[in-house]
Amino acid sequence: MYKRQAEKLVASNLWIDIGWPVTVEALSRLNYDSYTIDLQHSLIDRGTLTSLLQALSLGDGAPMVRLSQNDPAEIAFVLDAGAYGVICPTVETAAQCRDFVANCLYPPKGIRSWGPVRGLLYGGADYFQAYAGEILKIALIETARGVDNLDEIAATPGLDMIYLGPNDLGISYGASPSYTPNHPSVTEAIDRVSEAARRHSIVAGMHTASPEVARLAAERGFAFLSLGYAAKIMLAAAGKLHEEVFGHSRTKQ
């Protein structure tokens, strides 16, 4: 992930909302640049999370987690379980962002407590010096208030990425949820996130759900693109296969 950032390449991400380790293990063979296990909007619990992180170890993609909330105990758990990156939902102020980043880092830069458990398995003796400092800290901007405070949030020391969530952002502006950014305030926010990331020398990321939106985001300067939810992508692929063979789809709408 850091190598792609240094080379100014766009990194791919697949959103994991499936709690079955064997399925996630198979998806890891696709070798996306990264995978995000979703704890906010899925049925994945803590026990399952550890199994999914182990399953992702089969591939080369960086294992990441979206938190259910900005909670110190949950941040500590996902990092100790082996997450390489953490996405904090609904970051609306610089103070919230500072607290989030501090909980991801060991002293003197942060307040994370020592006890990495699985971290020692993949990082070994160098975990404290090398791996822990490379944890990706990502602030999810998904409300109008977050956009209003975007510049202060992006300036947070230690933050690696600001990530745009178009669905909830659209709702906060009074629109219906949509991965296609067509509300004027959402399209404006896309440019504002990209510009803020560039000003503060961090990465701009975005959740997309179609090749068209992904290409649009890349053209706007976004260097980290989530290409959709695993369950939805698998459903679409299986439905398309049935339609190609039998000439019709049986997918329930």
Give the location of each predicted region.
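Expand to "…catalyze enediolate/carbanion chemistry for C-C bond making/breaking, isomerization
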Residues: K3-Q253
